[in-house]
Curated annotation (Swiss-Prot):
UniProt comment concerning the protein's domains: 13 hexapeptides with consensus sequence were found at the carboxy end between AA 177 and 267 in a proline-rich domain.
Sequence repeat segments: 177-182, 183-188, 189-194, 195-200, 201-206, 207-212, 213-218, 219-224, 225-230, 231-236, 237-242, 243-248, 249-254, 268-273
Keyword 4Fe-4S: no
Protein name: P30 adhesin
Pro residues composition-biased segments: 151-161, 172-274
Region spans: 4 X 6 AA repeats of P-G-F-P-P-Q: 195-248
Gene assigned in the entry: p30
Ranges where the record places region Disordered: 128-274
Disulfide bonds: none
Keyword annotations: Cell adhesion, Cell membrane, Cell projection, Cytadherence, Lipoprotein, Membrane, Repeat, Transmembrane, Transmembrane helix, Virulence
Membrane protein topology class: Multi-pass membrane protein
Additional information: Spontaneous hemadsorption-negative mutants M6 and M7 exhibit a truncated P30 adhesin.
Gene Ontology annotations for the cellular component aspect, listed alphabetically: attachment organelle membrane; cell projection; plasma membrane
Amino acid sequence: MKLPPRRKLKLFLLAWMLVLFSALIVLATLILVQHNNTELTEVKSELSPLNVVLHAEEDTVQIQGKPITEQAWFIPTVAGCFGFSALAIILGLAIGLPIVKRKEKRLLEEKERQEQLAEQLQRISAQQEEQQALEQQAAAEAHAEAEVEPAPQPVPVPPQPQVQINFGPRTGFPPQPGMAPRPGMPPHPGMAPRPGFPPQPGMAPRPGMPPHPGMAPRPGFPPQPGMAPRPGMPPHPGMAPRPGFPPQPGMAPRPGMQPPRPGMPPQPGFPPKR
């Protein structure tokens, strides 16, 4: 497992602090042991027979130690403690100051980021408010223009010139199928009569075509089938009487005809009943 450099530095400093603290403890212990040995040596020298004889006159022998400030271990111990404290303070500052600075820098960056976001939000809100104001103003102007705008006036259209079309037959062109004859125009040769149109003057009946109502028979032309006799016209030989038509003068009665009714005048051309 690979540790980050920051954690490695912390562990290295902690190990050195433990080593220094252990070294100070060992040094203080050695100083205390040496001091005790020195005191015992001094006491033994004072209690030797020679010293006892020299001080025999004294009732008591007083053994007094040196003050603590005059002890040999006092200065190294105090110096070591101060040095350890200074080292701990220095190491703490060396480790803590970068951490505090990084944290402060991170807080400042976060604060700047929040301020930038707040500024962006303010700009966006200002743009939205400005856009809404412009839209409302444009809508109000459009509404006012719609109210003020007059109704469109009709555009005058100039009259179109009248075109006169000649629908009469063209010279050199055959008549078109289904084209009715024009009043006052001569009939075209070979043109058959049209149903529903009166016959043209001087137009002979066509073979296979039914005679037109009201058309008189033509001299030299045989009568057409189904053509009723005309008043004042001589009957045609071999023409049978028509139902609903009076018999023609000189026309013989036909077999199957009813006899004259009693009290009814005989029809012209019927012989008297025997």
